[in-house]
């Protein structure tokens, strides 16, 4: 049995370290409160694999994990070892044996798109973290398991600005806001299409990997049934093409075998009073209980979001945390 969870750390950085233009660095007191709070949430999750979003400093991530009191054999945030530049990175804490960790930054040439007024968009804004792990559970010792940690481009309008962060267009003009939102949509769509290729390369039984189990964790910045999420998962294609099952991803919430534990409505973020499930866990066919290729199942999915209704200090995450329990078969 393994627990998996995505965790938005909400700009986890060392004290005194500037991250976004116009936002003050954390002082020592605020940083300490952030470590204590995040460590406490990790302790509650007690997940075997945690995929982190918004990590500026690997040292801060390791400090937060240490505050949890839990033991992980690997804690890493590739690209943030000495501090991320320009945009936060993704991180991983795992108790499973790590075979390799890599970051996926660039799109294939055919996956690049032109974004109005910005030019060619050719790489993930936050490079994807890909890890190949080994579990001592499962049909055989050392069962391979891939994990993708993602953080797609947000729906926030992409306004034009200069290098100093000064606005270059009227943000009060509705037409300009619509065009800025289009830029964000194109960027997120391009990331989704590029990520789809990665998913297929891992899961296809006709591919180079021979089809290996995959768990995708992260902030999709849209709902599970949105166009961009389905570009990555292609779950809906299974309804009319059974041959698509091996390269589809399945929302853990939908394939959980203990549906009685579900709440009426799951959400991990509240924006302007509107709840959304942005933080998601997707699994390959190997974790769908009814599949003849199943090596396990999703037993249950839980959401930890009570803090979203508490005070809004920035040392808390503005996202809820989701945890899925994956049960691997033995023998």
Model regions and ranges:
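Flexible glycine/proline-enriched surface loops and loop-helix/loop-strand junctions
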Residues: 127, 176-180, 263-265
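Metal-dependent phosphoester-hydrolase catalytic domains
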Residues: 58, 99-103, 117, 122-124, ...
